Regions:
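Extended, low-polarity transmembrane helix blocks
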Residues: 1-30, 45-53, 57, 64-139
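Perimembrane loop-to-helix junctions flanking transmembrane segments
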Residues: 36-46
Length: 139
């Protein structure tokens, strides 16, 4: 693979990650595209409900590449809380696959990376930066 494709691949990873995050949020809040397991409810105001709201609001922002760095940092924190508060408490805190927390760990570190690396070239953040650079006065 050519190294010059790395920025575009960063954008692609960001877009796919956001697509998955939106689904996680809509399942929590709306039972779509898959219903919650039988007997599972997420009360308004609960930690899971707050997570769903962060995912439904933050997901589209990440997908479009708007306010990418701060939103990705917040979502990395959300996923860390999800892991340590939700999954690690079930036991096997050092083994995320054993407590079904590995998606939260993967999301956490990918969002942390995106918060440092930025959105990539296929984003509204990048488009706005290019526009500002082209209209900046030359000194």
């Amino acid at each position: 693979m050519k190294r010059e494709w790395a920025p575009q691949l960063l954008s692609l990873v960001r877009i796919v990650l956001a697509y998955l995050l939106i689904q996680a949020g809509t399942i929590k809040l709306f039972g779509f595209p898959a219903p919650l397991p039988p007997g599972v409810t997420i009360p308004v105001g609960s930690l899971a409900w707050v997570a769903g709201m962060l995912e439904v609001i933050g997901g589209p922002l990440i997908l479009l590449g708007v306010f990418t760095r701060p939103v990705a940092f917040i979502l990395a924190g959300e996923m860390a809380v999800a892991y340590f508060y939700g999954h690690a408490r079930m036991g096997h805190w050092l083994w995320p696959v054993a407590n079904m927390g590995h998606p939260a760990v993967i999301f956490c570190f990918l969002f942390l990376y995106i918060s440092a690396a930025g959105p990539g070239p296929w984003s509204l953040d990048a488009r706005l930066a290019r526009r500002r650079a082209s209209t900046a006065p030359v000194s």
